[in-house]
């Protein structure tokens, strides 16, 4: 229910940015969090509200990946990010389907050249989302100089 409410198509005033995948350090889930004051200004602009959705899991043996999850969960509790940064628990195929079909922008910013494919961006593009990506994974092959 939370996902349906967050991705409400009747709220076109909110730009929804999605990042949902396995949490590994090279995927840089927390890159946008490096300048928190700037991020707070961007997300809380009353003229252009933005929602940043995260979902995913770390491998059980990946302690740095689990630390990234904790960092995002702590951030979403900070007063300036409540309701603007959201981590959705219990990531699975059903939730992934909702996210790739409901986000306006799909974020892909791994350390190049470590992303083998990054198929979530393909699924988001097929559903009409814009991809905000570096040239790695599938985007390195799809980009032709005229399409983005």
What are these regions (language model features)?
Residues 43, 54-98, 103:
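Nucleotide-activated donor-binding/catalytic signature segment of Leloir-type glycosyltransferases, i.e.
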Residues 24-40:
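A conserved mid-protein helix/loop that constitutes part of the nucleotide-sugar donor-binding site
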Residues 8, 74-80, 142-144:
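Short, conserved catalytic or adaptor-binding loops enriched in Gly and charged residues
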């Amino acid at each position: 229910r939370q996902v349906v409410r967050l991705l409400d198509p009747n709220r076109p005033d909110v730009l929804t940015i999605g990042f949902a995948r396995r949490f590994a350090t090279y995927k840089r889930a927390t890159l946008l969090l490096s300048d928190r004051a700037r991020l707070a200004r961007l997300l809380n602009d009353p003229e252009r509200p933005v929602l940043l959705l995260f979902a995913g899991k770390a491998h059980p043996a990946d302690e740095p990946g689990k630390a990234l999850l904790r960092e995002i969960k702590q951030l979403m509790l900070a007063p300036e990010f409540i309701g603007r940064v959201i981590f959705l628990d219990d990531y699975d195929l059903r939730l992934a389907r909702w996210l790739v079909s409901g986000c306006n922008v799909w974020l892909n910013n791994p350390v190049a050249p470590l992303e083998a494919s990054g198929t979530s961006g393909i699924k988001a593009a097929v559903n009409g989302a814009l991809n905000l990506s570096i040239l790695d994974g599938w985007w390195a092959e799809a980009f032709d100089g005229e399409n983005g």
